[in-house]
């Protein structure tokens, strides 16, 4: 049996109180000991919140909207995922980052408590993209159907129960979005919403450029908006994850880029499930100024 065969569909493994993908949890010291540099740019999200979208936008901003430069490699190489480790299948994120020249763009889904201390010490710029929890739950469910390094999700009903309890990889969505929101008061952190990026991409991309000290003309902004639209990215083999082996991600079960819309949750949530989610939301999010849009029309 190859080293890669024993990580598929394994139960999550607890790391300092957080459920983590089994393959990623092996040799966790590599994460704790990771050394950042002050020029590192960290893209941080809860899973299925537009991470790849934001990664391509940031890469384009740093390259002044030059589409050809952004075609230099696949997204998983341009923007390595810090915690990624699938023995025998992929070079680990940490190993890839050692070879990546500065300024590095680093992707992670880690909760604040698990992020290597060196990112805080170096005051690395971070961009957090938050997406409403109902759409995240639906997207995460479909992702777990096709992503073999995650446990099988079971039925939608079973999965939603796990999601609401935080018994999914990276833990509670509620805790994740809330703790990163609070962190922006003490760290150079730009906090963005998926729904706002969807509704007014140029405005949000301007915020990203400003945060990264980049000045872009209107033509460059328009190129970025066009190149990073869902329709373009879904068909772009450099960013749609079709470059990964089918053993790891089976797009016949569900494409990595499925719909990319706001409000798809309405096609899955029953009235009872909506009430259940809203009750948990009210309890977990009390006292925070965070506000989420669950329907683009209401934005």
From Swiss-Prot:
Entry-linked InterPro entries: P-loop_NTPase, Sulfotransferase_dom
Gene Ontology molecular function: aryl sulfotransferase activity; sulfotransferase activity
Main location: cytoplasm
Enzyme type, top EC level: transferase
Tissue localization of expression: Liver specific.
GO CC term, one of those recorded: cytosol
Gene name of the record: Sult1b1
Keyword Transferase attached: yes
Chain's role: Sulfotransferase that utilizes 3'-phospho-5'-adenylyl sulfate (PAPS) as sulfonate donor to catalyze the sulfate conjugation of dopamine, small phenols such as 1-naphthol and p-nitrophenol and thyroid hormones, including 3,3'-diiodothyronine, triidothyronine (T3) and reverse triiodothyronine (rT3). May play a role in gut microbiota-host metabolic interaction. O-sulfonates 4-ethylphenol (4-EP), a dietary tyrosine-derived metabolite produced by gut bacteria.
Top-rank lineage group of the source organism: Eukaryota
Enzyme Commission designation: 2.8.2.1
GO biological process: 3'-phosphoadenosine 5'-phosphosulfate metabolic process; epithelial cell differentiation; ethanol catabolic process; flavonoid metabolic process; sulfation; thyroid hormone metabolic process; xenobiotic metabolic process
Record's subcellular location: Cytoplasm
Binding site for 3'-phosphoadenylyl sulfate: 48-53, 131, 139, 194, 228-233, 258-260
Reactions this protein catalyses: a phenol + 3'-phosphoadenylyl sulfate = an aryl sulfate + adenosine 3',5'-bisphosphate + H(+); 3,3',5-triiodo-L-thyronine + 3'-phosphoadenylyl sulfate = 3,3',5-triiodo-L-thyronine sulfate + adenosine 3',5'-bisphosphate + H(+); 3,3',5'-triiodo-L-thyronine + 3'-phosphoadenylyl sulfate = 3,3',5'-triiodo-L-thyronine sulfate + adenosine 3',5'-bisphosphate + H(+); 3,3'-diiodo-L-thyronine + 3'-phosphoadenylyl sulfate = 3,3'-diiodo-L-thyronine sulfate + adenosine 3',5'-bisphosphate + H(+)
Pfam family, one: Sulfotransfer_1
Enzyme active site: 109 (proton acceptor)
Family of the protein in this entry: Belongs to the sulfotransferase 1 family.
Keyword annotations: Cytoplasm, Transferase
Organism, as annotated: Mus musculus
Protein name: Sulfotransferase 1B1
Binding site for substrate: 107-109
């Amino acid at each position: 049996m190859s080293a890669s065969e024993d990580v598929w569909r394994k139960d999550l493994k607890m790391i300092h109180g957080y459920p983590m993908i089994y393959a990623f949890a092996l040799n966790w010291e590599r994460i704790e000991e990771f050394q950042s540099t002050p020029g590192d740019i960290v893209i941080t999200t809860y899973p299925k919140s537009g991470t790849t979208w934001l990664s391509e936008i940031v890469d384009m901003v740093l390259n002044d909207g030059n589409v050809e430069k952004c075609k230099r490699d696949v997204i998983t190489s341009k923007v390595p995922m810090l915690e990624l480790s699938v023995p025998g299948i992929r070079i680990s994120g940490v190993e890839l980052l050692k070879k990546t020249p500065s300024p590095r763009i680093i992707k992670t889904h880690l909760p604040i408590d698990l992020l290597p201390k060196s990112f805080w010490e170096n005051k690395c710029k971070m961009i957090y993209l938050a997406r409403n929890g109902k759409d995240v739950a639906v997207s995460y469910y479909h992702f777990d159907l096709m992503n073999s390094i995650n446990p099988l999700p079971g039925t939608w009903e079973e999965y939603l129960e796990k999601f609401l309890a935080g018994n999914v990889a990276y833990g509670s969505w509620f805790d994740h979005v809330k703790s990163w929101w609070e962190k922006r008061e003490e760290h150079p952190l730009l906090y963005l919403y998926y729904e706002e990026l969807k509704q007014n991409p140029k405005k949000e991309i301007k915020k990203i450029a400003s945060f990264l000290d980049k000045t872009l003309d209107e033509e460059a902004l328009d190129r970025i908006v066009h190149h990073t639209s869902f329709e373009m990215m879904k068909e772009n083999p450099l960013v749609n994850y079709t470059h990964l082996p089918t053993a790891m991600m089976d797009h016949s079960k569900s494409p990595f880029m499925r719909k990319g819309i706001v409000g798809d949750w309405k096609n899955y949530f029953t009235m009872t499930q909506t009430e259940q989610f809203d009750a948990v939301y009210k309890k977990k999010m009390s006292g925070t100024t965070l506000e989420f849009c669950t329907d683009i029309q209401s934005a």
